[in-house]
């Protein structure tokens, strides 16, 4: 029978441990990790995501602030705000909520954030460090969450065949690298790949991040596989709208595999690791040893 990997439950445990670390930082060092989220425009989904992030941060005792800017805010003004936040020693994490309006250069904005405050892990400096195995950098939140969920099922991933479906800079590429550093044999599938079913059927681990509803068929997944579904797609069925993943979740009912649901799988882990990055970033910026905190969080 299918086993559900409950991302909400796993994230709750991670955040409980993180709360202990935050309390220690306050008591022993007088440090209150401080996250600032910048949102441009009034996209409803972005507002919802930002609200969730701020609420979770405050629940953990972090200082959290949102800077909400009008849709027509100039790129120059946004860059000026980021520069101020970079120079503010009391701010440990900066996140610019995506997507941005079309008149703003996303890459320019992301790379204007100080790498040590880039809690999304999207800055070119952090991407370069990750690509070369320097894992003391800010690592993107969703890929970290994927690995953590996989390890709730199987701790030692060495020698596992892993398939990543999707090659985005946000999920596909970084999660493939993290799996490689776990000594997996990694195959990345994309729009030009052939024989997708054949590759997936050989996989011990599948990470689906392609952004297409139910793209990965249940018949492509072998018994015993671990499946992490990063996709979140809004579909309309029988006159009702709901979110589904990139994996044919319903078809796995009788397949003996481990799979994350959508929603309630990867999403909570992404927010959890955003807060982890903020806390670890505060330690680094304040010269506080963080290895014991990191090991306690990722147990």
UniProtKB/Swiss-Prot annotation:
UniProt-recorded Gene Ontology molecular function terms: methenyltetrahydrofolate cyclohydrolase activity; methylenetetrahydrofolate dehydrogenase (NADP+) activity
Recorded coiled-coil stretches: none
One GO term describing the cellular component: cytosol
Entry keywords, A to Z: Amino-acid biosynthesis, Histidine biosynthesis, Hydrolase, Methionine biosynthesis, Multifunctional enzyme, NADP, One-carbon metabolism, Oxidoreductase, Purine biosynthesis
GO biological process: L-histidine biosynthetic process; methionine biosynthetic process; purine nucleotide biosynthetic process; tetrahydrofolate interconversion
Annotated EC: 1.5.1.5, 3.5.4.9
Function (record text): Catalyzes the oxidation of 5,10-methylenetetrahydrofolate to 5,10-methenyltetrahydrofolate and then the hydrolysis of 5,10-methenyltetrahydrofolate to 10-formyltetrahydrofolate.
Known partners and oligomeric status: Homodimer.
UniProt name for this protein: Bifunctional protein FolD
Lineage: Bacteria, Pseudomonadati, Pseudomonadota, Alphaproteobacteria, Rickettsiales
